[in-house]
Amino acid sequence: MSAYVMSLVAKKLGYLELVDIGSGDGRIAYCGKILDFNSHSIEIDDVLVNLQNTICSETNQNFNPKCDDALEFEYSKLNLKKPVFFIGGLAQMGGDILATSIIKKINSISNLKMSTGIVFAGSDTKRQLSGNLSNGGWSSLIEENQLDVLDTVSLPTVWTFDQNVETPYIFTKFK
């Protein structure tokens, strides 16, 4: 249900394509496809991509699973016009490195930066290496990359065993 709500928020913000980075079982890309997005799923784990392919064939909903390293993937091949990128991973658990790389790739594609949205999964749970938890732990990256926060939606999802509260999803765009 949370993946559907996130995809619906992105739809209401006017995005046309959905790219789920570190997609796991593909639920966000799947929900995007149901909502008529041109969806793409990028996952490095071949077992999870096989699961996604099974879901696509069993449901007749092709959300374009790709078994690839998101850091190396050539996003220009997708011919994106107005995409929203969902970045898997928490900022303090390596997600910031992934997000920084994806942002650089977005910036390298002409005319894509100003039409792109990025959604981050946040956390309100303090961890050993976590710093500022504003904007779900993403505030430094948001400031460094000149992103505007459009909306924050807290949904009943749990990323780790020590987080027993809702997960904030931070919807951003370039300034």
PLM region spans:
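Glycine-rich SAM-binding Motif I of class I
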Residues: 26-30
